[in-house]
Amino acid sequence: MGQKRQRDQKGSGFQSKKRKRGANSSNADDKDDGWDGIVGVEDLNWKEVALPDRLDDAEGFFGLEEIEGVDIVRPEGSGEIRFKAKAGKPKKSILKNKTIPQEDKTFDDEWEGFSDGEAAQETTTTEPTEEPVQTTNEETEVKEKKEPKKKEAKKEVKKDAKNAKKEPKKKDLPSQKDKDIKPGLSFAALQDAEEDDGVDISAWESLGLSPEILNSLSKLKFSSPTAVQKSCIPPILDGHDVVGKASTGSGKTLAFGIPILEYYLEKKRRETKNKDDKKETSPIALILSPTRELAHQLVKHIGEVITHAPGVNARIALLTGGLSVQKQQRLLNGADIVIGTPGRVWEVLSGGQGLISKMKEIKYLVVDEADRLLSEGHFKEAHEILAALDREEINDFPGAEEDESDDEDSKTQRQTLVFSATFHRDLQQKLAGKGKWTGSDLMNKQESMEYLLKKLNFREEKPKFIDVNPVSQMAEGLKEGIVECAAMEKDLYLYTLLLYHPKHRTLVFTNSISAVRRLTQFLQALQLPALALHSSMAQKARLRSVERFSSPTADPSTILVATDVAARGLDIKGIDFVIHYHAPRTADTYVHRSGRTARAGASGKSVIICAPEEMVGVVRLAAKVHANMANGKRLPLESLELDRRIVSRVKQRVTLAARICDANIAKEKVSAEDNWLKNAAEELGVDYDSEEFDERQGRGRGRGRGRQQRERQASSISKAELAGMRAELKQLLSQRVNVGVSERYLTSGRVDIEALLRGEGNASFLGQVDPLGF
């Protein structure tokens, strides 16, 4: 046992000696290094702190510098503060290049100058060459000149081996012919050539567009330009500021999108000719939109032209709320066209560094739906953006005069393009007010221009005002109607109108978010495919609703219940019917709501469900919108008479669906209020009794007491009663609406048996129903 212990002691002693040797060797390396890593303030690699573009009050904090990854060291016996690198960070990373200690660069022998062979190699490498392989050899030779002479022979052998490995790679380098081929035209061009050539675009040739854009228009089946495109594209290409007014669905997006892409192609050709390859490019256009849906639609339409145009690789950055700010900032770095809503655009520009100065270099500023963006009390960020683009920075530093002159030049080069279907400020006034009202011509050119000149800083004193349809703001193929009913019967008449128009993609507009939620559940209870869209929804949910509604594979009877967030710019093919559940508050809102149908020369219908208290506003609306009509009708909207038999037969369905919907909404609201009160009571440490609280609330008086009582009664409906109402409603919906036909003796009435068997006609009714004469 003693021998074993003796051996263990020797082994442990041997291991400890090894550890000591390792420690001594590391210490020896540190000693050989000759530098402990502690430096002064002057030796650190300080970096200047970048301030944001928008800083209202800096309070003198300019010229600040910072450094990361250092620890503060106070040597004993000295009051001077010194620094060293943090653990795990290289010591040299915190130093300036000139302050790296020279002891690290220890050589084995002295440098004895250049040899004759090296001089010859230097003369050969100074000759210009185009092959990238030789440039790498030149770098290695420059490094060899700094090495000692004893290591020269070994490095020459290594260099020859590297060259031997690199020589076969020369075969893989592209030839001069391959360099001339554009990367965007590889196999995509062959695929496009195999497809059909598109439509005849001879009508576009008079506008002087490039072959790339004409090719894209041909593939997109745009055979001829619309009136607004034919009138606006030439002056925009000539460099004029343009104010374009046209009816909804007339193609205003391409009226300003095509000139922007033409300028992009011209800029690209200029850079290719001058061989100017700049990695950092500033945007050429900023397009502002009032809603997120319109911004996404602008990206889609302009992106389709870019996709089908060979050689057009313009990048579009979309800046809208509801999405990641960091991702949008990254997209903005290399973007050519910026499209967004004013709130998010201003958030990105004001929080970034150097973004506002980049935006000052844009060639085009496009304000889409300008009357909405520039209206009083709305979109404060839009005014901030316009002010920032026109603001001149005054500096006291050397060269400030040159910067100011550059800003003035960029300001004079920027074109301002304004588009909308309505411009006059009077159309934005509320229709239900008691103020003075006249039915005179309110849409003249002079007042519209004065309104815009106050809001925007045009380059020209008098921009070109192009009014494609000065007489009416409504589309030519649009039919307008009105249904008069009691205020409590709007649900009934809405359902009846939907039954009259099966397989029609319908858009229902309301004035409140709560009405959207209630109507969506109400229509879904009636087994109708209804979707909701309002501003309180998450961005992904909004995009999902629009996608489901506009999908070609969707049910043709899909109904979208929306607020005025969908009234402007939403271009969805196949919308046949627009219903105004609430009368619009302003005339311009009615114009844009009705403009969702009858787009691009198609036909469509727009119907207002009007209660007696809304009639005054509707009369004023019709007089303002149709002020220039030849006939002097007091109400130019056509009055629709629905079949009273159908209205009475579907009333039971509507009543059950409304009760089910109101009960569900009331239960959700009561449970949410109870949860909030319960949580508040727990935080305060008091007892909460829901019944006692309801009794105290019921004793009070005031506005809204009747609504609260109805909600309380609706929430008290049990699950069994709800299930019974759902079963009864399901049974009613399984049957067709009988309009006076004997179900036992079908042949005795006005029933076409063959049409029933073939599935023709309106499947909602049993019997002959005359369509609305409208």
Swiss-Prot record:
The name this protein carries in UniProt is ATP-dependent RNA helicase mak5
SUPFAM superfamilies according to UniProt: P-loop containing nucleoside triphosphate hydrolases
Residue ranges of domain Helicase ATP-binding in the record: 233-441
Superkingdom, taxonomy of origin: Eukaryota
Acidic residues composition bias: residue spans: 106-115
Residues forming the motif DEAD box are 368-371
Q: Which SMART domains match?
A: DEXDc, HELICc
Q: What is the annotated role of this protein in its UniProt record?
A: ATP-binding RNA helicase involved in the biogenesis of 60S ribosomal subunits and is required for the normal formation of 25S and 5.8S rRNAs.
- Protein EC: 3.6.4.13
Q: What are its GO cellular component terms? A: nucleolus
Instruction: Output the Gene3D superfamilies linked to this UniProt entry.
Output: P-loop containing nucleotide triphosphate hydrolases
By sequence similarity, the record places it as follows: Belongs to the DEAD box helicase family. DDX24/MAK5 subfamily.
From what organism does this protein derive?
A: Aspergillus terreus (strain NIH 2624 / FGSC A1156)
Which keywords annotate this record? ATP-binding, Helicase, Hydrolase, Nucleotide-binding, Nucleus, Ribosome biogenesis, RNA-binding, rRNA processing
Q: Molecular function terms in GO for this entry?
A: ATP binding; ATP hydrolysis activity; RNA binding; RNA helicase activity
Domain Helicase C-terminal positions: 493-643
Q: Which residues bind ATP?
A: A246, S247, T248, G249, S250, G251, K252, T253
Residue ranges of the motif Q motif: 202-230
Per the entry's comment, what about the domains? The Q motif is unique to and characteristic of the DEAD box family of RNA helicases and controls ATP binding and hydrolysis.
Q: Could you state one GO biological process linked to this protein?
A: rRNA processing
Record field: compositional bias (Basic and acidic residues)? 1-10, 140-182
